[in-house]
Amino acid sequence: MRLATEPASLPSGLPEPRRVAVLSVHTSPLAQPGTGDAGGMNVYVLQTALELANRGVDVEIFTRATSSADQPVVPVAPGVLVRNVVAGPFEGLDKNDLPTQLCAFTAGVLRAEATHEPGYYDIVHSHYWLSGQVGWLAADRWAVPLVHTAHTLAAVKNASLAAGDAPEPPMRSIGEQQVVDAADRLIVNTEHEAQQLVSLHQADPARIDVVHPGVDLATFTPGDRLAARAALGLDANSRIVAFVGRIQPLKAPDVLLRAAALLPDVQVLIAGGPSGSGLISRPGAGGLATPDNLVNLAAELGMTDRVTFLPPQSRDNLVQVYRAADVVAVPSYSESFGLVAVEAQACGTPVVAAAVGGLPVAVRDGVSGALVDGHDPGDWAGTLADVLAADPATLSRAAVDHAATFSWSHTVDALLAGYGRAIADHRARHQGQLARRSGRRFSMRRGVRA
């Protein structure tokens, strides 16, 4: 038996879940962020699960097995299990082909639940639309509420594609609409995302909870910049702008390279691996942000000696990357929040980010960094130069202060409140349905006696 280290702080009268089934079909929370499809969502799923467990809530995370070496059940921490569900081939299955394996995945989830006593889970929380499709069926089968977090929306991504990038297929938009309609509650990162759900998918605002993601404030902390640079083999005296994340057109690392080319004394550090359309160099799409194309672009811009590429980094090494940089750039075309921006600021590093999606929440414009409208390299170069010229101590303090307003504890406070509302509403609907059925049976009996 586990003891909660911190009581769940729910609004008075809301029920508290005992056990949560979390669905993350397309990417495991144990995967290294910055590789394949692993990114901020992986961090979110794992960190919220750990914090829920700290509150005494048991969490089982279901994800698709991607290797024959994956154990069926992986205990992560007391109260947190990851279940690797076999659904389709372990390797070589593109994310766009995963819908063909949702039936197999759903069957695996239902089989796992069948090993528990009836009524084991109190709630299902699905992440991304693929998981939402599974969650829709599982929640209905188990007669529990479905809470869904989209993380990204096809309509939003398609409205702001990088040049040459592939749009999301219509199948995804249809699937997202189905999940929005089926979910008892929808969790979004920002008010802006809530507005998008309402305008694009006609979501009921009363069913939406705004829950800011957090940051591990015990891990991501300020530190010695020179020591961090020495650990990474970087020059002690250079001005360094870092990019951290998956290398794909959506994240726009090529925009950073073109901007840095206009700043001759700036070094660029890129830490991450290919993902999505960043895995493929298509004919006629030479500008796409694939690793090979970025290397070629650096050569074309005459700045090969000013760009350092690192593979995806562990959390401890990632802290060193943030500390080593003078500025972290987040030039994404679309970003529902931007955990990288908050992690960097927690390490005392200011951020220059695109003014899209949730980044205006993650970065305090003019205080902890700066926001840039659009993706013109000249505009980015000018903003980077301004931030690099500002007082670093003032920016660093402001960055740390802003990041301190985001924590996984605060995230889970709000998440538990959303869970409580979902459970309460679901129970009320169920009781109402029972009452209506009982009333109909009574009326029928009276009619027979008459």
Curated annotation (Swiss-Prot):
The entry's Mg(2+)-binding residues are Y322, R323, A325, T349
Q: Does the keyword Metal-binding apply?
A: yes
Q: Which residues are 1D-myo-inositol 3-phosphate-binding?
A: H26, D37, A38, G39, G40, M41, N42, K95, Y128, T152, R172
**SUPFAM superfamilies in alphabetical order:** UDP-Glycosyltransferase/glycogen phosphorylase
List GO BP terms, alphabetically. Answer: mycothiol biosynthetic process
- What is the similarity comment for this entry? Belongs to the glycosyltransferase group 1 family. MshA subfamily.
Q: How does it assemble?
A: Homodimer.
Functional description taken from the UniProt entry: Catalyzes the transfer of a N-acetyl-glucosamine moiety to 1D-myo-inositol 3-phosphate to produce 1D-myo-inositol 2-acetamido-2-deoxy-glucopyranoside 3-phosphate in the mycothiol biosynthesis pathway.
Q: Which NCBIfam families match?
A: mycothiol_MshA
Write down what this protein is called. D-inositol 3-phosphate glycosyltransferase
Organism, by scientific name, is Mycolicibacterium vanbaalenii (strain DSM 7251 / JCM 13017 / BCRC 16820 / KCTC 9966 / NRRL B-24157 / PYR-1)
Q: What is the lineage of its organism?
A: Bacteria, Bacillati, Actinomycetota, Actinomycetes, Mycobacteriales
